[in-house]
């Protein structure tokens, strides 16, 4: 009689985990999250991508250090859509008044498509946020994808059916 070998599953890579987190969104939202992520990766190639999987949202921060507090921008995806947060939002010049929110540290804009990131007023905000960052991004290299937290309680990230 052969002894049965118990196969221990290999832990998922950070990229595989992120794909799983994104898969819980509606298909249209999945496409948006991936396209915005690609655009921000191009914009911040040396940034650490910090992923926080909360029960009602998926947050991806772009940090020069790997610490969330140092993130320059972050996306937050939920059933209501995708927002781009600027960590020093209240201090950023916003002549077109596109920044929303009233917090002491952040402001955000709604992202309808990755093309939103190419708008001159959004580009200006991104440039200023980069220039004003307390810690600057490394000039070269490729940042890592880091799963910072994953919620134990998983809830669907789709709009409730009416």
Question: PLM features: residue spans?
Answer:
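Charge-dense, helix-prone N-terminal extensions
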Residues: 1-162
């Amino acid at each position: 009689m052969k002894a049965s070998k118990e196969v221990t599953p290999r832990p998922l890579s950070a990229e595989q985990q992120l794909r799983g987190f994104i898969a819980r969104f509606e298909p249209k939202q999945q496409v948006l999250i991936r396209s915005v992520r690609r655009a921000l990766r191009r914009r911040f190639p040396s940034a650490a991508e910090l992923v926080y999987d909360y029960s009602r949202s998926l947050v991806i921060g772009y940090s020069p250090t790997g610490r969330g507090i140092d993130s320059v921008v972050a996306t937050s995806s939920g059933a209501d859509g995708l927002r781009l947060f600027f960590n020093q939002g209240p201090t950023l010049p916003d002549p077109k008044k596109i920044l929303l929110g009233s917090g002491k540290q952040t402001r955000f804009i709604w992202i309808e498509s990755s093309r939103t990131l190419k708008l001159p007023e959004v580009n200006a905000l991104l440039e200023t946020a980069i220039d004003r960052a307390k810690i600057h991004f490394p000039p070269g290299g490729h940042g890592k994808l880091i799963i910072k937290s994953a919620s134990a309680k998983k809830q669907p990230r789709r709009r409730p059916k009416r």
